[in-house]
Swiss-Prot record:
It comes from the Eukaryota. Expressed in fetal and adult brain, leukocytes and fetal fibroblasts. GO terms for biological process: microtubule bundle formation; microtubule depolymerization. This is Nck-associated protein 5. It holds the Pfam family NCKAP5. PANTHER family: NCK-ASSOCIATED PROTEIN 5 (PTHR21740:SF0). Residues 71-253 form a coiled coil. Keywords: Coiled coil. The keyword Transferase does not apply.
Length: 1909
């Protein structure tokens, strides 16, 4: 209770308190209210105050404003008053003035009256009108006076009027009077004036009438003259065509008389007859012109040589020798027209005059040659002698050739299976026109030669000595006559005696000489590097050791093959040294010429290089190819003839000049060599001294050839690449030394350097070879040391001012030398390059060569010495191949050496690592940041010595270590560029050299510089070895990626571990990056050497897998490699063959490219010839590849696999995957290679262009068409090039590289075209495997021989590609660092990617894109274009090869990827260009995604090529392609469509075709497209996606594809072989038909290649190529069995169809494309755009900065065509667009690159739609072909969106109408259009004159074929 109360109380209290508070609360509330009211009042008062203030303010303001108004008014009033006063004053003044005027008027009136009186008097005096006329002048004078007076009067009157107006009131009356008076006077004046004017008019009218009459008369006269000229030209064309057709008929009759083997005999006979005709005519006309001076000498030397080589001639190689004898001339003279068909085309188009003009000379020379031959015949079998005596030159030639062919056939049969013989020798022979002569013979010789070689080992010293004397003697001749040189070099190379015999023949017939040489070399090499793998495998295995033992002789012969006697031990070394020296001296003389007048040297170098190139190509190609392998040799040989003939004239002049210096040089070198030679002879096998001596001597010799090759390479000796590398080195070193000697050019040591340089150049080049040779004898360390010291000594001697340290000498010395050379070169060469992009081809080539070659040579040589030393055992044979790849020594030896050095050369490796370690070891370990100081050297050195490390080297070289991660794939790009440069060395290297100059100038130069150097090095090392180079390029890109990303780990892991895996495996793994190069080279050497290497390490497995891959890769890499690869491939099986094919293709591309720069250098106008030469060489290489491939039906797969395995690093693990993935990997590799393609692109472009030229004499860029017969391989090489270019774009992954590529593309537009040509060429070559290779060439040009050769892509990209994932990932890492998958994984991914068009293309495309992106730089743009085109081409081709459908998918994907890469890297290229490129790329991606699936239809591509040729077909093809592309890349395609106009149509077409595509293809394509699209935004992402996503698809597809490809290849082998012979023009058709889908693909590729070539600058070749393309197209469509007959029939049909379609497409193109053809199809008149192809359609073509962007599209749009090409084709990019852009091509490739680029692109399109044989594939391919044209257009579009647009449309239309035929037709059209350019015109005319009908038919046929399919 209490508690409650208390609570209540509390509550109450609370309430109380509450109440009280309430009261307070209430009060407070009131108070608050009060306060609030107060506040409100205050607020109101404040407001009132404010308002009042405001009012006051307003009032104040008003008042102030009023005051202001007042002031204003007052002011105004004052002013008015002032004005009033002024006006009054003025009035007064006016009044005064008026008075004055009145006075003046009076005076004027008086004057007028006087004048009137005078006039009256005058008129009266005039009397009659005649009198008046007579006095008209007086009257006129008077009239003028009157007019003046009147004027004055008028002025006065005006003044008066003014005054009067002013003073009107006061002066109105006076003014009126004055006015009246003036009016009267004016009237009188007017009347007089009218009278006077009437008289004057009468006079004028009469004068005008008279002038008009004169003009009419003059016009009529001019028209009559023009008509007469046209008629004359037409007559010549027709004559040449008749001649060609007669030859073809002869061949066909023979072939029909005899089947397979008889066929092969007959083919040989046919070749022989053609050789006789061409050799005697062409070679005589050109070579004999040169030789006339040295004829007696040559005869004497030949005779002498006969004596020396009688035994050899009588050796198994005798048959080959004789053909060689016959062929060399043909090779030399009709290098452009490698075959009669080629000759006819070329002659009819551009070289006709040569053939025609040379007919008398030919007959005379023929008799001389026949006399020579008779002399030789005395030693030769009686069969040869009697024909020579009895028959006329042509008949004698024919009988000789036939006899030789028969004997070769017999020997071949003995040495290798008839199929191998027929396929290889014949296919080689057939594939390249030269190849027809040299490759087939090569194979025969080679095949039979191993015994000779082995037997010769006993007398290498003897023979070499004799040969040496002969060489010395014959050196001049050799200079004059590549045959002689080839023979001379071949003699040392070919088992001394056999080689001698070959040499003898070579003297007579460079082609056959070195063909036989090559064959013997190859044979010897083959025995060592199994050329006929299966049967030669044991030989190879036993021969490998033998070769190892023989290494001094065989290895040396390989080296010597490359270098001449070098490879044959000391005797051979001496001989070759002499030859090489002689050659090199020639080269050096040329170089000196070059050095002396940088510009002239460019020409001289071009000519001299060409001469050397031809000669060295003959010799070096003969040797290099023999050395490196028949394929390579063929390749080389093909280029040799190609170059020989185009360069023959220049060559002839320069040969004399060079000969003089050459003799002197020869003496110097010989003395140096002899000083070392006796030692070499005595101590070659001894080891250290030998190394030193040999290095000095042999290296000098090899250096000569290599340097020359390199030199030549940059100057367009694609086939001389190996030699170019060696010769280039020697050339450059010697050039430097000679220059120092003659013109202390770069190096300080003039005399020592002369001697040492001669030594050193050769030593470095040879030393690696010798070390390779010695390597077997020596320890790696010893050799390394020996090499190190020898090279060091040499280098120190050479580079007295350079770093002397030996350890550094190798790395640093090399670097020093390289810096010296590179610095010299970069400073002088690069600067020169930079400043002489135009001069760059020759000068850049030269400087680059000097930079690259000299330094590279030193570098390479040095690294080579150590590298080879280290890797000699492996490289022993390979080095031989490497020897021709001496530059690639770094690559091959570098790769091998690097692993070897890494493993074996522990001490040296650091040195080498610094120098080659920078390249190889450092590359492996790291980009070799240490070398960065000597980076330029390192670049050169590393690329040179370690092509695998080349990327590292490249990046190391140019890039800083920090750049290594970036450089790896930059390096891959660079490496790719390097390799590509080598691949497209002539154009690319040259371009790239320039481009590297540019690159060096630019930040990209880090990459590009390595690129140039890498190009130089890659090109030098990998240059000729297309395999080696390719390998190197391959390796470098691969290594670069692997090495770049996992720098040491991947590279070393791959390089060292895999190197450990058997050095071949290392070659395979490092080969993925480094061994790839090695492998490539090994494929070349390891084909023989690979086995040797692998024998050394794991002969069987490396041989099969490692070696097979490596050698195959190398084979792929190099033609020579191809030969061994063939042998090797045969033993290795498909893989070897595949890789060989790849290598071969690579060499083809490489060679072509090498040749291309020469072409470029020579002149963009003669690109056709050169391209044809290059194409021929490439074709040879391709032929070798084709042979290799046909030999291995699964060769494409095998190659791919080998490439893939190399790529994968796990030969076995990837063996199957490789097989399946091999293709994709090749694609990947090609991509990296394509990445390598910055240079490779160019080279590829060049290759493509060359290929196209070979293929299409008519269409320089479409080489493959005419050269189809012998350019099938070329076409493949072409394809390879095409593919390579696209491959390059991947490498282009790094923006820099891409810029570089583009830069090169501008320069190597040829390269691009060549790449495409290579791509197309490759397919033609190996319809199945070659197709794959071609596709890889296209899609991953490097991936396949096509890639490696066409671009580094084939080998480089192949290596790259085969290390593509590795390399690609590395390349891709720049795009997406994370994408860098473990090399193996990445490789597998790449493989899978390769297998999955999407994945592979994505990877390839992206890297290609990157590459392209890199090339977007104006310098690289064409290359980039090339690269993209190539990348896509490789994709397309790879897919085509791998899986036509897949290719389709892959190609599109590659396109997309490339586009992505391009887009990603586009910023690198000029914004506009980049944008254009991006558009193009998108377009291309669309088209390519669609095209990818149609890649399988690459064969139809030739149709677009033809259309491109004609410039009217392309739009259609692109439309078709567009459809496919649309499916995958509708958006991109739409953009393209906007850009290309026909894009939509293409897209629709593509869609339709794509729908038709197999679902797998579609899926893959879609995936690829998706991936591509993904990658479009993030390149890396796309690649990553593609890698991860499409690997399986690609893998599956690849698996499927290889199988398809295998059978097609097998079919292709025989039928293609026959067809090639039968249809030199129809060469593409043969493989295509046989290959079926693959064949179609190949054919398309070929055609596309032709197109690309056309664009690139081989418009002429392209035209001819397209002629052949259309033929091949028809042929391809024809069943394999009926291939021979139907090839011709189809050819006619195709041509007919092409004519109709051509016209139709012409119309379409006229409306849609920029290129317009007359209905007659006479010529493609580029629309303003087309004319601007370089500028407009080919915006990126010239340098294709946008090319890089469209580079992927390039694949579709042929942008890859050259421009590096420009860049490349870089192109260095054969495509339909090529055809459409021939003018551009001619302009830009002629300006060289644009056309090439366009061509490269177009061939891709062409290729895509090409496969008409496979219905779905055909349509798809048509679509693909269309995208290619689109790409080409894109490429052009980069340059000129409008131009590009019409091109794709054109391509689309062609694809749609008759993709195959139309593509060829487009090519023809383009060629005709391209014909607008100088060479293109020539070839275009040929293609059009002879090929127009064919093209039209082909196009027409294409439509029916398409319908059929």
């Amino acid at each position: 209770m209490e508690g409650k109360r208390q609570l209540e109380k509390r509550d109450f209290g609370k309430r109380l308190s509450l109440d009280s508070s309430l009261v307070e609360y209430m009060d407070s509330n009131k108070y608050i209210e009060h306060l609030l009211t107060q506040l409100e009042e205050q607020h109101r008062s404040l407001w009132r105050e404010k308002l009042a203030v405001a009012r006051l303010q307003r009032e104040v303001a008003q008042r102030t404003s009023e005051g202001a108004m007042h002031e204003k008014l007052i002011h105004e009033l004052e002013e008015e008053r002032h004005l009033r006063l002024q006006s009054e004053k003025r009035l007064q003044e006016v009044t005064l003035e008026s008075e004055r005027n009145r006075i003046q008027m009076r005076s004027l009136q008086q004057q007028f009256s006087r004048m009137e009186e005078t006039v009256r008097n005058l008129l009266q005096s005039q009397g009659s009108p005649e009198q008046k006329k007579e006095e008209t002048v007086n009257i006129m004078v008077y009239q003028e006076k009157l007019s003046e007076e009147e004027r004055k009067h008028k002025e006065a009157l005006e003044d008066l009027h003014m005054v009067v107006d002013e003073d009107s009131r006061s002066e109105s009356s006076s003014t009126d009077e004055g006015k009246e008076k003036t009016k009267l006077l004016l009237e009188r004046l007017k009347a007089l004036e009218a009278e006077n004017s009437a008289l004057a008019l009468e006079n004028e009218n009469q004068r005008e009438q008279y002038e008009r009459c004169l003009d009419e008369v003059a016009n009529q006269v001019v028209q009559a003259l023009l008509t007469q000229k046209d008629l004359r030209e037409e007559c010549v064309k027709l004559k040449t065509r008749v001649f060609d057709l007669e030859q073809q008929n002869r061949t066909l009759s023979i072939l029909f008389q005899q089947r397979v083997r008889p066929t092969s005999d007959l083919l040989l006979q046919k070749l022989h007859s053609r050789l006789l005709d061409l050799s005697s005519g062409d070679l005589l006309s050109e070579v004999e012109r040169n030789r006339s001076l040295t004829q007696s000498r040559t005869d004497a030397e030949v005779h002498e040589h006969q004596l020396n080589t009688k035994s050899a001639l009588k050796c198994p190689g005798l048959g080959a020798v004789i053909p060689g004898h016959l062929c060399p001339r043909n090779s030399y003279s009709s290098s452009s027209e490698l075959s009669l068909s080629s000759t006819c085309s070329e002659y009819s188009s551009g070289s006709s005059y040569t053939w025609h003009d040379g007919k008398n000379l030919r007959k005379r020379q023929s008799s001389q040659n026949w006399d020579k031959r008779l002399s030789i015949d005395s030693s030769l079998p009686s069969g040869f002698a009697s024909p020579t005596n009895e028959l006329p030159p042509t008949r004698i030639k024919e009988s000789h050739i036939l006899e030789g062919l028969r004997k070769l056939q017999k020997r071949k049969v003995l040495l290798e299976p008839p199929s191998v013989i027929t396929k290889w020798g014949y296919k080689d022979c057939m594939n390249s026109n030269e190849g027809i002569y040299s490759p087939g013979i090569k194979s025969s010789s080679l095949k039979e030669y191993p015994p000779c070689k082995t037997a010769d080992l006993g007398s290498p010293c003897k023979e070499p000595h004799k040969t040496f004397v002969y060489d010395l003697d014959s050196h001049v001749d050799a200079d004059d006559d590549p045959s002689t040189l080839a023979l001379l070099q071949a003699v040392p190379n070919q088992s001394c005696r056999p080689h001698g015999s070959k040499l003898t023949h070579s003297v007579s017939d460079s082609l056959f000489g070195w063909e036989t040489n090559r064959k013997h070399f190859l044979e010897g090499t083959s025995s060592v590097y199994p050329k006929e793998r299966p049967e030669k495998l044991t030989s190879c295995a036993s021969s490998c050791p033998l070769e190892m033992k023989l290494c001094p002789s065989v290895q040396t012969p390989q080296v010597q093959r490359e270098r001449g006697p070098q490879g044959q031990g000391h005797g051979r070394m001496a001989l070759n040294l002499q030859l090489s020296d002689t050659d090199d001296n020639e080269t050096f003389d040329e170089l000196h010429i070059e050095s002396s007048d940088e510009k002239s040297p460019s020409d001289v170098s071009l000519a001299a290089d060409t001469d050397k190139s031809v000669e060295n190509l003959d010799v070096l190609v003969g040797f290099g190819k023999s050395l490196c392998g028949s394929p390579e040799e063929e390749e080389k040989q093909v280029p040799i003839p190609s170059e020989t003939r185009p360069k023959t004239f220049s060559f002839i002049k320069q040969q004399r000049v060079v000969k003089r210096t050459s003799s002197e040089e020869c003496v110097t070198v010989i003395f140096d060599a002899e000083d070392g030679e006796p030692i070499e002879f005595s101590s070659h096998q001894t080891g250290v001294v030998t190394v030193t001596r040999n290095e000095i001597s042999i290296n000098s010799t090899p250096a000569g050839p290599k340097a020359e090759h390199t030199e030549l390479l940059p100057q367009g000796i694609a086939c001389l690449q190996p030699r170019a590398a060696a010769r280039d080195y020697t050339f450059f070193k010697r050039s430097e030394e000679d220059t120092e000697k003659n013109i202390p050019k770069d190096n300080v040591d003039n005399v020592p350097r002369v001697s040492t340089e001669s030594f050193s150049s050769r030593t470095v080049t040879q030393n690696p070879q010798q070390q390779k040779l010695v390597k077997p004898t020596h320890n790696i360390s010893c050799q390394s040391n020996s090499r190190s010291s020898a090279p060091m000594g040499i280098y120190q001697k050479q580079n007295l001012t350079k770093i002397p340290p030996r350890g550094k000498s190798s790395p640093q010395k090399s670097k020093l030398m390289e810096p010296e050379a590179t610095t010299l070169l970069p400073s002088s060469g690069l600067v020169t390059l930079e400043k002489s992009p135009a001069l760059a081809p020759g000068k850049l080539s030269r400087f680059m060569k000097t930079e690259s070659s000299g330094p590279l040579f030193e570098l390479r040589s040095d690294p080579h010495i150590p590298k080879h030393s280290a890797q000699l055992p492996h490289s022993s044979r390979m080095p031989s191949r490497r020897d021709w790849v001496q530059c690639p020594k770094s690559q091959t030896p570098g790769s091998r050496s690097r692993p070897a050095i890494e493993s074996s050369d522990s001490g040296e490796p650091p040195t080498r690592d610094e120098h080659c370690g920078s390249g190889p070891e450092a590359g492996v370990k790291s980009p070799s940041p240490p070398p960065p100081p000597g980076r330029s050297v390192s670049l050169l050195a590393r690329p040179s010595y370690d092509y695998s490390p080349a990327p590292s080297s490249t990046k190391s070289e140019t890039r800083v270590p920090s750049e290594t991660a970036r450089t790896p794939f930059k390096s891959p790009l660079l490496k790719g560029i390097s390799a590509p440069v080598i691949s497209s060395n002539p154009a690319t290297t040259e371009v790239q050299r320039k481009k590297p100059s540019v690159a060096f100038k630019k930040p990209i130069f880090t990459h590009p510089m390595p690129s140039p150097e890498a190009v130089i090095q890659t090109r030098c090392p990998a240059h000729a070895p297309s395999s080696s180079f390719t390998v190197m390029a391959l390796g470098p890109p691969k290594v670069s990626p692997k090495r770049g990303v996992p720098k040491t780990s991947p590279r070393q892991t791959l390089g060292t571990p895999q190197r450990d895996i058997g050095l071949q495996t290392p070659r395979i793994s490092p080969s993925t990056h480094e061994p790839l190069e090695m492998t490539s080279s090994k494929s070349v050497s390891p084909g023989r050497k690979g086995q040797l290497n692998d024998s050394a390490s794991t002969p069987p497995k490396p041989s099969f897998l490692g070696v097979n891959e490596s050698p195959s890769s190398q084979v792929s890499s190099s033609s020579s490699s191809s030969s061994p690869a063939k042998s090797h491939n045969s033993p290795h099986g498909c893989q070897s063959a595949h890789e060989k094919g790849l290598k071969t293709r690579l060499p083809v591309g490489l060679k072509v490219l090498m040749k291309s720069p020469q072409l470029l250098r020579k002149s963009s106008t003669v690109p056709g010839k050169h391209e044809k030469d290059s194409l021929n060489e490439a074709s040879k290489s391709s032929v070798a590849v084709n042979k290799s491939k046909p030999e291995d039906s699964k060769n494409p797969a095998s190659m791919e696999i080998t490439a893939g395995e190399r790529n994968v690093t796990l030969p076995d693990s990837q063996a199957q995957g490789s097989l399946a993935d091999g293709l994709p990997l090749e694609t990947a590799l090609q991509e990296p290679l394509e990445s390598s393609i910055p240079g490779s692109d160019g080279r590829d472009g060049v290759d493509n262009r060359s290929m196209r030229r070979s293929l299409s004499s008519s269409k320089p860029h479409l080489k493959p068409a005419l050269g189809m017969n012998g350019a099938k391989a070329r076409s493949h090489s072409f394809s390879t090039h095409s593919g390579d270019k696209p491959s390059t774009p991947p490498i282009e992954g790094s923006g820099k590289v891409r810029t570089q590529i583009i830069t090169n593309t501008a320069e190597r537009g040829n390269s691009l075209t060549r790449q495409n040509s290579s791509t197309e060429s490759s397919p033609n070559k190996a319809p199945s495997a070659p197709m794959l290779e071609s596709l890889p060439s296209v899609g991953r040009p490097s991936g396949h021989p096509s890639s490696g050769k066409g671009s580094l892509g084939s080998s480089g990209s192949f290596s790259s590609q085969h290390g593509s994932p590795s390399k690609l990932p590395l390349r891709i890492p720049p795009k997406s660092e994370g994408l860098l998958i473990p090399p193996g994984k990445e490789d597998q991914q790449a493989f899978t990617q390769g297998e999955c068009p999407s994945a592979n293309v994505a990877v390839l495309g992206e890297p290609g894109s990157d590459r392209r992106s890199c090339p977007p730089t104006p310098t690289d743009c064409p290359e980039a274009l090339q690269s993209p085109g190539r990348t896509q081409h490789p994709s397309t081709f790879e897919t085509s090869s791998t899986s036509k459908l897949e290719t389709s998918g892959r190609h599109p994907d590659a396109s997309a990827t490339a586009t992505d890469a391009v887009s990603s890297e586009a910023p690198l290229s000029p914004t506009i260009e980049e944008k254009v490129m991006l558009c193009i790329q998108e377009n291309v991606e669309k088209g390519q995604v669609q095209t990818k699936p149609t890649s399988v239809e690459a064969k139809q591509k030739p149709g677009p090529s033809f259309a491109s040729w004609f410039g009217f077909r392309k739009s259609r093809l692109p439309a078709l392609s567009s459809r496919k592309m649309d499916i995958s890349k509708t958006k991109v395609e739409k953009k393209d469509a906007k850009v290309l106009g026909f894009g939509n149509r293409q897209l629709k077409s593509e869609r339709k075709k794509e729908k038709k595509k197999p679902e797998l293809q579609c899926e893959t394509e879609n995936e690829l497209i998706k991936d591509t699209k993904s990658a479009d935004n993030p390149d890396g992402g796309l690649q990553s996606k593609n890698n991860r996503r499409t690997p399986q698809d690609i893998y599956n597809q690849l698996k499927i594809e290889p199988r398809n490809r295998h059978s097609p290849v097998a079919c292709s082998t025989k039928d293609t072989f026959m067809t090639e012979l039968l249809n030199r023009v129809d060469k593409k058709a043969a493989p295509q038909t046989e290959s079926g889908s693959s064949n179609a693909s190949c054919r398309n590729v070929l055609k596309g290649s032709s197109q690309g070539s056309c664009l690139i600058g081989s418009s002429i070749s392209t035209q001819g190529n397209h002629k052949k393309n259309m033929k091949i197209k028809a042929d391809m469509e024809v069943p394999k069995d009926s291939l021979v007959k139907e090839a011709n029939e189809n050819l006619q049909e195709d041509e007919d169809d092409a004519v109709a379609d051509s016209v139709f497409q012409s119309h379409i193109i006229e409306s849609n494309c920029q290129m317009r053809t007359l209905d007659s199809g006479i010529g493609t008149f580029p629309l303003p755009d087309s004319g601007n192809r370089s500028t407009g359609r080919y915006l990126c073509q010239p340098d294709s900065p946008e090319d890089a962007e469209p580079l992927l599209p390039l694949q579709s749009a042929l942008s890859a065509v050259s421009s590096m090409r420009a860049q490349t084709l870089e192109r260095e990019v054969p495509s339909s667009t090529d055809g459409q852009r021939p003018a551009d091509s001619a302009i830009v490739h002629s300006t060289s690159d644009p056309i090439m680029t366009a061509r490269g692109m177009r061939p891709l399109q062409s290729r895509l739609p090409k496969p008409a044989s496979s219905g779905k594939v055909s349509s798809q391919k048509q679509n693909e072909a269309e995208p290619r044209p689109q790409t080409c257009s894109s490429f052009g579009y980069a340059e000129d969106p409008m131009a590009s647009q019409p091109l794709p449309d054109w391509g689309s239309e062609v694809a749609a109408t008759g993709t195959q035929d139309k593509a060829p037709r487009m090519c023809t059209y383009s060629a005709s259009g391209g014909s607008n350019s100088d060479s293109d015109l020539d070839y275009g005319d040929n293609g059009f004159g002879a090929g127009r009908g064919q093209l039209v038919k082909a196009l027409k046929s294409a439509a029916p074929e398409i319908e059929t399919t």
